Amino acid sequence: MVESHLTDNKYIRYFCYVMLFELFLLGSGQDLPLAGGLTLRWLNFFIGVGASVYMFVRSDDFPKSILAFILVYTAQLLIGWMLAFVFDSEMAYLMVDFKPLLYFYIVLFFYYMMTSELMIKRVVDILLLCVKIMTVLYLIYMTLTDVLGLFSMTGENYHSVDDSGSFMFRGVGSSLFYKGFVYLPIGALGFFWRKQYVWMALSILAIYFTYTRGLYVLLAFGLLAFYLKTHEVNIFKIVGLMLVVLLLYEVAEVLEIFQFDDTYLENREESDSVRLITIDQVFDRITWWSLLVGHGFGQGVPERPAHMEISYLDIFHHQGLFGLAFWVALFIAILKYGNSVVGKFKEEAAFFMTAAMMIFLQSCFNPYINNSIGMSITLLAFVICYRLSQDEYFTSRSTV
């Protein structure tokens, strides 16, 4: 059966929309438990993977590049598991490290769904709708609390509001940080691309009221990178811009530039100290073999037994240079495929390529690339840029 017949199934399409809506709006995905620890996100994942296996068996389309990434990724996970058993990792910590990484296998489902111009447009539509919802709700919340003072919701810095840790007080007035807020700068970029400047301004205002330096940097980088890419600037210069932005961020941290006003007094000393201690403990435990393949899942450090703040540090500790090389290769593949798209779909490729770069950049500070929040937009960028670069596979025919 040809692939287009499979994606013509309206129920599969509607399921895909529900999955994307949940991914973009519900942050970590832990706030909608169904039964026995199963959440809506993981239910969607299992359905999506099952559908993708069915599509793979019935379709005559075999994406060799994507399958190669899946095989290498699987090899990584197997090595991580073997090392975990060699070093007798605690099962609880092992699963905490391993479970989020499974979400990578949704990539094949995304591939088989992104088969038309309008399907890709729907992804952007759903993303921007979710950003609008987050923007409006957060601005209403901040207006009622800090602006009008009708009620107050204050807490200590980085104090979790809920059990899942999806919401945290910032320590500045009633401001909150929500894990899904990483999509606010990406949404602002989408509004800029689509010339929806009112929504762009509102989303930027919401970003301001998060009092989160990383989101400010992400917003500035995303807008500048997208502008440069759509104005024929070489992609290597944009990657260089990523490194410059990262350097400037660190300089700003040292000079306390973000603390020129009481509004920006985030009191990040404790959080920064945890990062530095974690880095030191990770490097203290490097051996010749861990340098290559890591210590395996479930092997943390005293400061962070699981889930290190910096994604790349977490990947390096558990999977070594082999693990980091995989994500570097994926990053290069996204740039390669996205940069090869010319003509009609150039701006679509530029948007998703920039969104992926924003996630890769933010993962220098927070754990995004190695969980479903960041992995989803990165895999969508990979698949969509791959699709758009393959003229023989992509069609503008609507299946929506």
Model-predicted regions and their roles:
Residues 1-58, 78-84, 141, 359-361, ...:
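N-terminal signal-anchor transmembrane segment
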Residues 2-4, 187-254, 341-344, 350, ...:
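Hydrophobic alpha-helical segments of polytopic membrane proteins
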Residues 42-43, 68-78, 89-113, 126-131, ...:
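Aromatic-anchored transmembrane helix interface
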Residues 124-152, 170-228:
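Alpha-helical transmembrane segments of multi-pass inner-membrane proteins
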Residues 140-146, 230-266, 283-288:
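A membrane-periplasm/extracellular boundary helix in multi-pass inner-membrane enzymes
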Residues 262-319:
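Long extracytoplasmic/lumenal interhelical loops at the membrane interface
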Residues 304-340, 361:
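A conserved mid-to-late transmembrane alpha helix and its immediate loop/hinge
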Residues 352-360, 368-400:
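Transmembrane alpha-helices of multi-pass inner-membrane enzymes
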